[in-house]
Structures are given as C-alpha cells and as structure tokens.
C-alpha cells in the first residue's frame, strides 16, 4: 500500500487574515537574559526597533522548557499571554492532542546546565529535541517551518542528521545567530557576484560558545561572492602562540586583521598580543580558492565583532554592532526575519545550508585544535554549495541605535524579566 507523503500543515483558520500563525516555543531554559528571553519575550510583548515598537504578527501559544530553575520567568510570561506550558515537546506541538496543531516551531537549544564533551564543547541536546519535533511531524504526516537558534547542533554529525531529516520530511528550516542581522558600521553588503579572494573575521569570547557567531557573521558576507557558496576543503584550528606565528608568517592576513579590528569602535586599549591570553583561530580553505581566517581575541575584543575582505583587489571592512542593553535590539531584527520566515511558510533570509556549513567548520576547527595538535583537517564532507537567497535580510541601516532600540524595556508589567 502506498503511504501518504508529508504535506504542509493546514491551519483550521487562514494564516492570511483570520488570526496570527500559532507558534510553539521549545527551549532549554527561560530566564532573564538568555536567548529564550531575548527572542521569545519580544514575540510575546513587542519587538523594539529603530522604527518603533512593532506588534508581533505571530502568536506563541505553547511553551516547553527542559530545565526550570529559581530564576525562571517563562511560566509567568506564558501565563500573562495565555500560552500554556506543556510537560513534553510533543504536547507543546499538538497542544495536548494527537496531531500537529501549531503553524511553526521556534527552537532555542541554548543555555542551561549540560555536560561537556571530550573536546570541551557543551553538549546541548539539540538533536534529541529536534528529533522529538520531527517525530510529531512524521506521526502527523504534516510539517511546519522550524527555526533553530544559533546552530543546529554541537557536532557535525548531529547537525548533518538534523539537516537530512528535515529534508526527508520536507521541513523548511532556518537556523543561526543574530549577528547577520546586526547593524554594520560602516554600512557594507557585498553585491551578489563580488570577487572575494581573502577575508578575516574577529570577535571575542571562546571559540566553543562564540565562534559560531563570528562564523555566521563571516559567512553571511562571503556567501555573496562570485559563483555562490561552494563549500570548504580544509579547516585548521590553532591557539596560543601558533596564532601570532600564523599572523607573522602571513597565513593570516595582517592587513585584513588590522582593518577588521580598526573598524571596531569599542575595544580594549593596548596591545592585542598583551591583552589576549588565549588567542584562537580557524584557518579555512574554501573549494573555490577563498582563504579565510576566523579569530577569537577575548580580552581585546569583548562582545564586539569585525570583518574585512579583499574584494576585487580593494580592502573593505565593517563592524557588526550589537545593540545596547537592556533592549538588545539586534535580536529584534533576528525576530523580524524569523517572523517573515514563518509568515511566508519557509522563505528564509538565512539559508539553513549556511548554518550547516558553519557548524561543520566550527566542529572540525575545534577537533583540529584539541585532537589533531593544530594540524589541517581535510573536509570533503563540507562540499556544501548554495546561493544566497533572493529574500533580503531585515537589518538596521542606521549607523547607531535609535528609536525604540534605545527605548524603555521591558514594557510596563514585565519589570520582573530584568535580573536584579
């Protein structure tokens, strides 16, 4: 007997007028300042932007949290907005029934208390949680768009399984960091088809937790080069003096590194080499010849990011600027892109292949650093090719935060979400 193929979930009422698309929020934890707060709270109470406070076009109707501690705000926010907190992922997607009953899923598998791998990487149970989401789709014979925050999974094999399973079930996916949706100073976006020969990106923090942000920022720029994305042939992860040696020997372009750092307005005063106790870098060779370096320079750069590239023999650079606390409006622009992805039932300004590639680069880079003594790792499995989507990303074009990006936050009645 021929089985019915997967089909798009059909709402009981129209998504184009009668009501807002219903969203299930699946998250590790929901505490002040975590990604569930910075994304979910904006979808509950309003999206602060340079152009004012924007009312959400989607409605979170169900919530599931893996860990609930004394700082939890998720239960209270859900109750204030008539969203039910469910005991299982399946219940949150079916609203306690037997079949899929929401129009989209936002999955935030970040933060919380989880063990580390032998590589020193936090083993967030993303594949486990997403498999449970896919299982509901498979049982229901229907799918809806899924957004996965930051990255698909902590390991390449898990990420590839998630990607392949989503493709098998026809699930539209969007994944990634908020960095591609930050304001850029100066304003810089490569025209599609640009000839980029070398590029460097810099950021702070540890490679494990912050490297993915730097990679996502970098990839959203270089994927616009001539021929589109073609994938990566090798990755090398180095740290400590090996990073300084790579700069001195020309394996990392000092000119591009200096330009990327020069574009960053808020960095520590003094010598980079004296301030950074543990520099880390990924040296990336792309299949089409592009040579790239991703550096984490904690101590010199702190929650700041820069990018520079050689484009048609000219060096250009920019800073990707986070919006100030407590609004963190760069998440607002990520939310606007997620919302459009849901409303258009799968049109994404952040191709999931971008995130799959950055996941693989990061995992192989850390493996090179920890297991291979900094040697080059060949990556034929990262032959991931795609073209930048023709859906323009929504990101702020003003040079500095303005309007509601600097306004009152949180809204009246939600003061409890600010951690004292």
What positions do the PLM features span?
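Beta-strand-loop-alpha-helix segment that lines the small-molecule cofactor/substrate pocket
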Residues: 110-180
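Rossmann-like dinucleotide-binding domain that binds NAD(P)(H)
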Residues: 199-290, 297-301, 360
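NAD(P)-dinucleotide binding in Rossmann-like oxidoreductases
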Residues: 268-354
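N-terminal Rossmann-like dinucleotide-binding module
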Residues: 5, 9-79, 199
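A structured beta-alpha segment of the ubiquitous adenosine-cofactor-binding alpha/beta core
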Residues: 81-115, 129-138
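Conserved acidic residues
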Residues: 61, 99-103, 197
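C-terminal helix-rich "cap/oligomerization" subdomain common to oxidoreductases
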Residues: 3, 9-12, 16, 120-122, ...
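Redox-cofactor binding/interface segments in oxidoreductases and associated redox assembly factors
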Residues: 25, 103-107, 148
């Amino acid at each position: 007997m021929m089985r019915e193929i997967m089909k798009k979930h059909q709402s009981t009422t129209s998504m184009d007028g009668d009501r807002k698309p219903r969203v299930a929020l699946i998250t590790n934890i929901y505490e002040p300042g975590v990604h569930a707060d910075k994304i979910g709270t904006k979808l509950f109470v309003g999206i602060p932007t340079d152009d004012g406070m924007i009312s959400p076009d989607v409605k979170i109707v169900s919530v599931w949290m893996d860990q609930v501690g004394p700082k939890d705000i998720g239960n209270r926010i859900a109750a204030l907005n008539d969203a039910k907190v469910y005991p299982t992922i399946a219940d949150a997607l079916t609203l306690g029934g037997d079949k899929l009953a929401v129009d989209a899923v936002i999955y935030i598998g970040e933060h919380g208390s989880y063990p580390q791998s032998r590589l020193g990487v936090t083993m967030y149970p993303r594949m486990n949680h997403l498999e449970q989401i896919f299982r509901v789709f498979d049982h229901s014979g229907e799918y809806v768009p899924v957004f996965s925050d930051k990255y698909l999974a902590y390991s390449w094999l898990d990420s590839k399984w998630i990607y392949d399973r989503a493709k098998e079930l026809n699930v539209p996916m969007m994944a990634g960091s908020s960095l591609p949706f930050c304001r850029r100073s100066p304003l810089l976006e490569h025209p599609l088809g640009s000839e980029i020969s070398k590029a460097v990106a810099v950021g702070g923090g540890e490679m494990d937790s912050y490297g993915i942000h730097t990679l996502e920022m970098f990839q959203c720029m270089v994927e616009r080069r001539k021929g589109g994305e073609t994938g990566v042939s090798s990755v090398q992860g180095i740290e400590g003096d090996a990073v300084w040696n790579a700069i001195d020997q020309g394996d990392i372009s000092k000119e591009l590194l200096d330009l990327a750092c020069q574009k960053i307005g808020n960095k520590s005063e003094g010598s980079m080499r004296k301030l950074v106790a543990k520099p880390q870098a990924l040296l990336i060779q792309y299949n089409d010849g592009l040579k790239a370096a991703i550096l984490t320079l904690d101590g010199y750069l702190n929650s700041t990011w820069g990018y520079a590239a050689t484009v048609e023999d000219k060096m250009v650079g920019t800073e990707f600027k986070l919006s100030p606390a407590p609004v963190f409006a760069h998440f607002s622009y990520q939310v606007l892109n997620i919302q459009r992805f849901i409303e258009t039932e799968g049109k994404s300004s952040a191709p999931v292949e971008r995130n799959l590639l950055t996941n693989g680069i990061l995992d192989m880079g850390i493996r090179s650093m920890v297991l291979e003594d900094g040697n080059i790792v060949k990556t034929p499995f990262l032959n991931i090719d795609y073209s930048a989507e023709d859906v323009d990303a929504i990101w702020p074009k003003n040079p500095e935060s303005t309007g509601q990006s600097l306004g009152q936050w949180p809204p009246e009645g939600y003061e409890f979400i600010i951690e004292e």
